[in-house]
Design a protein with these regions (language model features):
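Non-catalytic cap/lid and distal C-terminal segments of serine-dependent acyl enzymes
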Residues: 19-135
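Sec-dependent N-terminal signal peptides
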Residues: 4-14
Length: 135
């Protein structure tokens, strides 16, 4: 009986932090006329986003070469870091968007063959502003 009680206590103590994490959404996508393809992105919404009408600032995070839109979530653990810093009062709540940059260097090419900068400024930012409560 003591062994079962110990397992239950360990299990419950391990899940309390999970309830407090911000909302992570991976595999979201937007079609880009500039790039002529779907562009995947991840978005992290602050805790309480779903139950409020608060508008939040947005931070766009870009991954490095060889990474993708999930890199910051998988290797950088940004959702936990973001949540911890908000709870410690070091930063205010915000929305984080991590678009897939492919091998674009996040800029338009001189010959116009890749228009990632155009996509970001004219398509992604307005899309996020229109579909999420941003300020």
């Amino acid at each position: 009986m003591k062994k079962i009680l110990l397992y239950i206590i360990l299990f419950l103590s391990g899940i309390d932090g999970a309830w407090a994490l911000p909302i992570e959404k991976e595999g979201m996508s937007i079609y880009s006329p500039s790039l002529k393809q779907e562009v995947s992105y991840a978005i992290i919404l602050p805790e309480g986003y779903e139950h409020s009408d608060t508008e939040y600032p947005v931070l766009y995070m870009f991954h490095g070469i060889g990474g993708d839109y999930t890199s910051w979530l998988e290797y950088g653990n940004v959702a936990r870091v973001m949540d911890k810093m908000i709870k410690e009062g070091k930063i205010q709540p915000f929305i984080m968007v991590i678009p897939d940059g492919y091998l674009s260097y996040y800029s338009d090419t001189y010959d116009g063959s890749s228009l990632y900068e155009t996509f970001f400024i004219k398509e992604l930012v307005p899309y996020i502003d229109n579909n999420y409560r941003t300020r």
